[in-house]
Curated annotation (Swiss-Prot):
Belongs to the YjjX NTPase family. Its EC number is 3.6.1.73. This is Inosine/xanthosine triphosphatase. SUPFAM superfamilies: ITPase-like. It comes from Klebsiella aerogenes. Phosphatase that hydrolyzes non-canonical purine nucleotides such as XTP and ITP to their respective diphosphate derivatives. Probably excludes non-canonical purines from DNA/RNA precursor pool, thus preventing their incorporation into DNA/RNA and avoiding chromosomal lesions. It comes from the Bacteria. Homodimer. Keywords: Hydrolase, Magnesium, Manganese, Metal-binding, Nucleotide metabolism, Nucleotide-binding. GO terms for molecular function: ITPase activity; metal ion binding; nucleotide binding; ribonucleoside triphosphate phosphatase activity.
Length: 54
């Protein structure tokens, strides 16, 4: 079963996957899905932009 429907059922927030998502619920709104994805992309690309990795 997908996480979105389970989280919607648990929290009562309709279509939670289109809103704050599980990240927002688990962190009480301290982190957003967007901020977490942004950090993940920056970390994934850092070896290509930092000489220390060469």
């Amino acid at each position: 079963e997908a996480l979105g429907p389970v989280m919607s059922q648990h929290t009562g927030i309709d279509q939670i996957g289109r809103k704050e998502g599980a990240i927002g619920v688990f962190t009480a709104g301290k982190l957003t899905r967007s901020s977490v994805y942004h950090q993940a992309v920056v970390l994934a690309l850092s070896p290509f932009h930092n000489a220390i990795y060469r």
